[in-house]
UniProtKB/Swiss-Prot annotation:
Organism listed in the record: Synechococcus sp. (strain CC9902)
UniProt GO molecular function: ATP binding; proton-transporting ATP synthase activity, rotational mechanism
UniProt record similarity statement: Belongs to the ATPase epsilon chain family.
Keywords: ATP synthesis, CF(1), Hydrogen ion transport, Ion transport, Membrane, Thylakoid, Transport
Protein name from the UniProt record: ATP synthase epsilon chain
Recorded superkingdom: Bacteria
Membrane topology, from the record: Peripheral membrane protein
Gene, per the UniProt record: atpC
One Pfam short name: ATP-synt_DE
Protein location: Cellular thylakoid membrane
Subunit (UniProt): F-type ATPases have 2 components, CF(1) - the catalytic core - and CF(0) - the membrane proton channel. CF(1) has five subunits: alpha(3), beta(3), gamma(1), delta(1), epsilon(1). CF(0) has three main subunits: a, b and c.
InterPro entries: ATP_synth_F1_dsu/esu, ATP_synth_F1_dsu/esu_N, ATP_synth_F1_esu_C, ATPsynth_dsu/esu_N
Protein task: Produces ATP from ADP in the presence of a proton gradient across the membrane.
GO cellular component, one term: plasma membrane-derived thylakoid membrane
Ranges for region Disordered: 104-136
Amino acid sequence: MSLTLRVLAPDQNVFDGSADEVILPSTTGQLGILTGHISMLTAIDVGVLRVRANGSWNSIALMGGFAEVDSDEVTVLVNKAELGSSIDANAAEADFQKATTAVAGMEGQPASPEKVKAQQQLNEARARMQASKSAD
């Protein structure tokens, strides 16, 4: 028995297939899903979704959204997502370093829309970098 996983973004169907295990980056921490899991709805944080299918792990960078688990079906609706295998690891690392520098440059400044945006870009760059490295 396996799970059916669907990862949907506004512009694409990122993943649609079966999985033995799914680990979601929920807003309250990592959430592991196996067959027979109780039905639930959870908020998804910016992070990496991990999928185990046929003994191997794959990663998907998620940029926030929601997930529903019901009758061994996991549906993840996100703002944006990328398969780890399609992310250029070197470019993701460079984006992460650039975002880290931008956030560090705002250290000690009062809260502002620019500071919030910089932190969000850092979180997204971190997720992309982690997903690209997990794809190896």
